[in-house]
Amino acid sequence: MREIVHIQAGQCGNQIGAKFWEVISDEHGIDPSGNYVGDSDLQLERISVYYNEASSHKYVPRAILVDLEPGTMDSVRSGAFGHLFRPDNFIFGQSGAGNNWAKGHYTEGAELVDSVLDVVRKECENCDCLQGFQLTHSLGGGTGSGMGTLLISKVREEYPDRIMNTFSVVPSPKVSDTVVEPYNATLSIHQLVENTDETYCIDNEALYDICFRTLKLATPTYGDLNHLVSATMSGVTTSLRFPGQLNADLRKLAVNMVPFPRLHFFMPGFAPLTARGSQQYRALTVPELTQQMFDAKNMMAACDPRHGRYLTVATVFRGRMSMKEVDEQMLAIQSKNSSYFVEWIPNNVKVAVCDIPPRGLKMSSTFIGNSTAIQELFKRISEQFTAMFRRKAFLHWYTGEGMDEMEFTEAESNMNDLVSEYQQYQDATAEEEGEMYEDDEEESEAQGPK
């Protein structure tokens, strides 16, 4: 089977990673000690994608837990599903990265990275036919962002032909831990643009807004935000974990979703949005699910898709429902909103249906969009970055770990290039496409969008 090796790095990465394993273990009928207690063959048919079956018929996640300080991993280990993980796969330092990207990427993280790679190798040798890696991390801290991106480039070196997929939590001033988040995020995005195949942008700003506006939670906690993240991660991995035809592995998803190699930052969405521990009273209809999942309020990235255009979209519907109705609704949305889909990629919306709904819902839908509106998120970070960088505020923490200012300038311009590329394809029309390629590449970039 086609296995995926999961890596979680840093405090945020370990918390959303642990939550992800709780949710999918529940969906596959795996109890906290790794025994199968489910009731459907569908749960086991592709279980080997994420789990390794040990000799005692126990299922062990193909997960590697990494952090530069022991705190978060101790709480994962003592949490509900702590005994599920392989004890050797907990790798941690003692020093911490102090929210400093340079410590995670160049100094502290670099010392720990080889012992992580040993475990990665061991997990990959356990695989029959590895399809790729997924990393959960945040971009605002030190370990997840700095060491996370270091791991990506090291793993990439060793497994160049395997897919690299990340769930990256993007920082926001609304839910901020540190003042240097824009630095860490910009340096990380500089790496992600070059070294990953698929990145789901999970945006703390959007999660906070959903909790506050839609779920009416007065003071959202990280637990509430992580509940949304785990619902989304469970949704976007559905077609990898359950039998089906569409986007059944990471590479097929990448082929459908990524028209240009640098533009691989996806906007996830989920419907229906429910608060933690609440029961849903009424099953939604397919039209309602479709309506909601294309709604800006349901996006996990704080960007308004109406400000851009979709290059590609993949959706997953879960639960017992009529395929015909799903197809009709999806076509209806596309024909009503055709101006929001680029016309030079025909059939750019793909739909998968899985019979098994998530816990507590009769039906749900998950949305993965590659929209040019994601540039709003990069612009937001870029503005915060520039405000500090032009005064060289806080730079000594980074140069003190051996970094050069030049690296900051490069990261800044790479992110600005990314924004212009999204803008260029947002403005492109089918007629102009031909001319665009005839021009010299540099020339068209110098002119910006036509």
Swiss-Prot record:
<feature type="binding site">
    <location>
        <position position="177"/>
    </location>
    <ligand>
        <name>GDP</name>
    </ligand>
</feature>
<dbReference type="GO" id="GO:0030425">
    <property type="term" value="C:dendrite"/>
</dbReference>
<feature type="binding site">
    <location>
        <position position="204"/>
    </location>
    <ligand>
        <name>GTP</name>
    </ligand>
</feature>
<feature type="binding site">
    <location>
        <position position="15"/>
    </location>
    <ligand>
        <name>GDP</name>
    </ligand>
</feature>
<keyword id="KW-0963">Cytoplasm</keyword>
<feature type="binding site">
    <location>
        <position position="138"/>
    </location>
    <ligand>
        <name>GTP</name>
    </ligand>
</feature>
<dbReference type="GO" id="GO:0005200">
    <property type="term" value="F:structural constituent of cytoskeleton"/>
</dbReference>
<keyword id="KW-1017">Isopeptide bond</keyword>
<feature type="binding site">
    <location>
        <position position="222"/>
    </location>
    <ligand>
        <name>GDP</name>
    </ligand>
</feature>
<keyword id="KW-0966">Cell projection</keyword>
<dbReference type="GO" id="GO:0072686">
    <property type="term" value="C:mitotic spindle"/>
</dbReference>
<protein>
    <recommendedName>
        <fullName>Tubulin beta-3 chain</fullName>
    </recommendedName>
</protein>
<feature type="binding site">
    <location>
        <position position="226"/>
    </location>
    <ligand>
        <name>GTP</name>
    </ligand>
</feature>
<feature type="binding site">
    <location>
        <position position="143"/>
    </location>
    <ligand>
        <name>GTP</name>
    </ligand>
</feature>
<feature type="binding site">
    <location>
        <position position="12"/>
    </location>
    <ligand>
        <name>GDP</name>
    </ligand>
</feature>
<dbReference type="InterPro" id="IPR003008">
    <property type="entry name" value="Tubulin_FtsZ_GTPase"/>
</dbReference>
<comment type="subunit">
    <text>Heterodimer of alpha- and beta-tubulin. A typical microtubule is a hollow water-filled tube with an outer diameter of 25 nm and an inner diameter of 15 nM. Alpha-beta heterodimers associate head-to-tail to form protofilaments running lengthwise along the microtubule wall with the beta-tubulin subunit facing the microtubule plus end conferring a structural polarity. Microtubules usually have 13 protofilaments but different protofilament numbers can be found in some organisms and specialized cells.</text>
</comment>
<dbReference type="GO" id="GO:0042277">
    <property type="term" value="F:peptide binding"/>
</dbReference>
<dbReference type="GO" id="GO:0030175">
    <property type="term" value="C:filopodium"/>
</dbReference>
<feature type="binding site">
    <location>
        <position position="69"/>
    </location>
    <ligand>
        <name>Mg(2+)</name>
    </ligand>
</feature>
<feature type="binding site">
    <location>
        <position position="142"/>
    </location>
    <ligand>
        <name>GDP</name>
    </ligand>
</feature>
<dbReference type="Pfam" id="PF00091">
    <property type="entry name" value="Tubulin"/>
</dbReference>
<feature type="region of interest" description="Disordered">
    <location>
        <begin position="425"/>
        <end position="450"/>
    </location>
</feature>
<dbReference type="GO" id="GO:0000278">
    <property type="term" value="P:mitotic cell cycle"/>
</dbReference>
<dbReference type="GO" id="GO:1990791">
    <property type="term" value="P:dorsal root ganglion development"/>
</dbReference>
<feature type="modified residue" description="Phosphoserine; by CDK1">
    <location>
        <position position="172"/>
    </location>
</feature>
<dbReference type="GO" id="GO:0030426">
    <property type="term" value="C:growth cone"/>
</dbReference>
<keyword id="KW-0493">Microtubule</keyword>
<dbReference type="GO" id="GO:0007411">
    <property type="term" value="P:axon guidance"/>
</dbReference>
<feature type="binding site">
    <location>
        <position position="99"/>
    </location>
    <ligand>
        <name>GDP</name>
    </ligand>
</feature>
<dbReference type="InterPro" id="IPR037103">
    <property type="entry name" value="Tubulin/FtsZ-like_C"/>
</dbReference>
<dbReference type="InterPro" id="IPR017975">
    <property type="entry name" value="Tubulin_CS"/>
</dbReference>
<feature type="modified residue" description="Phosphoserine">
    <location>
        <position position="444"/>
    </location>
</feature>
<feature type="binding site">
    <location>
        <position position="11"/>
    </location>
    <ligand>
        <name>GDP</name>
    </ligand>
</feature>
<dbReference type="GO" id="GO:0070062">
    <property type="term" value="C:extracellular exosome"/>
</dbReference>
<dbReference type="GO" id="GO:0000226">
    <property type="term" value="P:microtubule cytoskeleton organization"/>
</dbReference>
<feature type="compositionally biased region" description="Acidic residues">
    <location>
        <begin position="429"/>
        <end position="450"/>
    </location>
</feature>
<feature type="binding site">
    <location>
        <position position="144"/>
    </location>
    <ligand>
        <name>GTP</name>
    </ligand>
</feature>
<keyword id="KW-0991">Intellectual disability</keyword>
<feature type="modified residue" description="5-glutamyl polyglutamate">
    <location>
        <position position="438"/>
    </location>
</feature>
<feature type="binding site">
    <location>
        <position position="143"/>
    </location>
    <ligand>
        <name>GDP</name>
    </ligand>
</feature>
<dbReference type="GO" id="GO:1990890">
    <property type="term" value="F:netrin receptor binding"/>
</dbReference>
